[in-house]
Amino acid sequence: MVDPLCNYNVLEAIFSYLELNDLYRCSQVCKSWYHFLNDENSDVWRWHCLRKLPKESVKSDLLASVSTYKTKLRAYLHAWSPNDCSRNVYIKPNGFTLHRNPVAQSTDAARGKIGFRQGRHAWEVIWEGPLGTVAVIGISTKEAALQCHGYVALLGSDDQSWGWNLVENHLLHNGDMQGNYPLLNNAPKYQVGERIRVILDCDDNTLSFEKNYEFLGVAFRGLPDKKLYPTVSAVYGNTEVSMVYLGTPLDG
């Protein structure tokens, strides 16, 4: 008779050396393997997390909203893309925070590594430096520009991007101001360091926001059936913006 502990240790050793795509396939093999991999704080996920993430990020307060090794790893895989941002932006060693270099008369943007066309997705955006005259968060397709001359609301300036300008509390799309947001009398302005939760519903084709766990309402409806990416655009030199992917939003 095989010792269950021995079987567990063998699986742990094997799964720790597989690629992440292979782990998903393994979870579909049988109930036993599914339950084994469903433990998001197991040594398997710990090993993969520590192997992929920078050490400084694993226990960082930035990842306070993703408490397990598996969700931390998932957040890292969805973070800002160093290959899909303005030349005036770089991604810091923690993997989650972008830094805009102090380049005059330029507006610069960055997209996440992974876009979405199906399902419901949520991520947090934390502006960790000054906003400047324009600071926009939202989504875009791959066709949206990531850099332009001047200090403008780049995100939302064309038909391939949708954004919320945190400085003026305006919604922007196709170069037009779509209205005030949120729809509150004397809506408070964003304070540096606050976490804003972005909620993209690809089933209902809507984009919404939350701040301080308060739902602010649907910002955009009728989004196209295209792959949409988390995006921000910034103008202030040396400002920094972090993004943490959370997964499927919890209702209520």
From Swiss-Prot:
PANTHER family: F-BOX_SPRY DOMAIN-CONTAINING PROTEIN 1, SPRY DOMAIN CONTAINING SOCS BOX PROTEIN. It comes from Drosophila virilis. It is found in: Synapse. Belongs to the FBXO45/Fsn family. Pathway: Protein modification; protein ubiquitination. Component of an E3 ubiquitin ligase complex composed of hiw and Fsn. CDD domains: SPRY_Fbox. GO terms for biological process: negative regulation of gene expression; negative regulation of synaptic assembly at neuromuscular junction; neuromuscular synaptic transmission; positive regulation of protein catabolic process; proteasome-mediated ubiquitin-dependent protein catabolic process; protein ubiquitination; synapse assembly involved in innervation. The keyword Ribosomal protein does not apply. One of its GO terms (cellular component) is nucleus. The gene is Fsn. Residues 1-48 form the F-box domain. Residues 58-250 form the B30.2/SPRY domain. Keywords: Neurogenesis, Synapse, Ubl conjugation pathway. Its main location: other. This is F-box/SPRY domain-containing protein 1. Required in the presynaptic motoneuron to down-regulate the levels of wnd and restrain synaptic terminal growth at the neuromuscular junction (NMJ). It comes from the Eukaryota.
